[in-house]
Amino acid sequence: MNRSRRTFLAGAGAALSSGVLAASGSRATAETTARPATNDAPRGLTFATIRRGQELSLAIKTERGLLDVRTAESVFHAKAPTAIDEVIGRGGGAALQALLAKALASARKDLFLDEAKADFGPCVTNPEKIVCVGLNYRKHAAETNSAVPTQPILFNKYNTALNGHRGIIKVSEEAAKQFDYEVELVIVMGRTARNVSEKDALSHVFGYCTGNDFTARDLQRVSSQWMLGKALDGSAPIGPYLVTADQVPDPNRLKIECRVNGEVRQSSNTADMVFGCPSLISYISRYFTLKPGDIIFTGTPEGVISGYPKDRQVWLKAGDQLTSTLEGLGELRFSLS
């Protein structure tokens, strides 16, 4: 591990007192799985964002394809949210369920899009905050010769980093050369959270999605701060689906995988997280407010390129195809150009 990385980790550990996390329930394997309680919050629905010309529109995954909510709303003269921002933290569950029932009972095929042909946007389109967690898997910490953190290591990305399913990251336009993958479980907040307990933390979650914290390692190591290597345009692909929290019984026990050009590079389980979802939400909310639509990248498992011996480190390049998968959340694909 290089000097700047050691400096960053040491600083992160010294900045906060060692007793900042409660002893009980701080590990992923012993955490509660409470469910959201937002009034009229959608339940049992799997959302996507699709592009319609210059617009981003809400879609619902069904056995017949993706229901184009905006088109269905117009056809049935209904009033329902037509963008994911209008759903997260604002409700609309009953209206969406009613619209979905009408669409499924209809013989109209034009209400549904073939997922294989749909143009996906990020499944969350306008988060106020994109919070990321470093070294949050035990085996990932080991492969990078880093100590297991005693409190979460946080950094951030920006909205310009958002990308969607089948999106493209233009690495050939970047000054960096050492590009790496990081498949991650992403938490999407559904209620405002400030100083919430671990016990109540998951009741503030809207849903979960698959993400990849795409990273430029050479820029990450420029200084003790990781931002340059983490905030590249398009470096936060998420999706294709946003699955409501009621459909995820335990986010701390999900299979997680990343493939590069069809080759499995990462294969693990979120049970290896050092700090599980309730701990992360509670910890973050002690220091700043999490709002509906904010997203949390929860860390990556072992298998990243930077964890290989130096003589085996073959960095990602233009033309590579990446596939990230979380159990029950869908398969996120993107490519490099």
Name every feature range the model reports, one short phrase each.
Residues 1-2, 7-28:
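N-terminal export signals
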Residues 125, 132, 180-182, 291, ...:
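Residue-level recognition of short, solvent-exposed, well-ordered loop/turn junctions
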Residues 61, 146-165, 181, 318-327:
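Structural signature of FAD isoalloxazine-binding scaffolds in flavoprotein oxidoreductases
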Residues 35-39, 48, 120-122, 142-145, ...:
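A generic local secondary-structure boundary/capping motif
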Residues 5, 12, 29-152, 321-323:
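N-terminal non-catalytic cap/leader segment that marks the start of a structured domain
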Residues 135, 157-159, 166, 173, ...:
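Short, structured patches in soluble enzyme cores that scaffold and shape functional sites
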Residues 60-65, 189-191, 261-262, 326-328:
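Short acidic-glycine loop/turn motifs at beta-strand connectors
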Residues 36, 170, 217-337:
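Catalytic-pocket segment enriched in acidic/His residues
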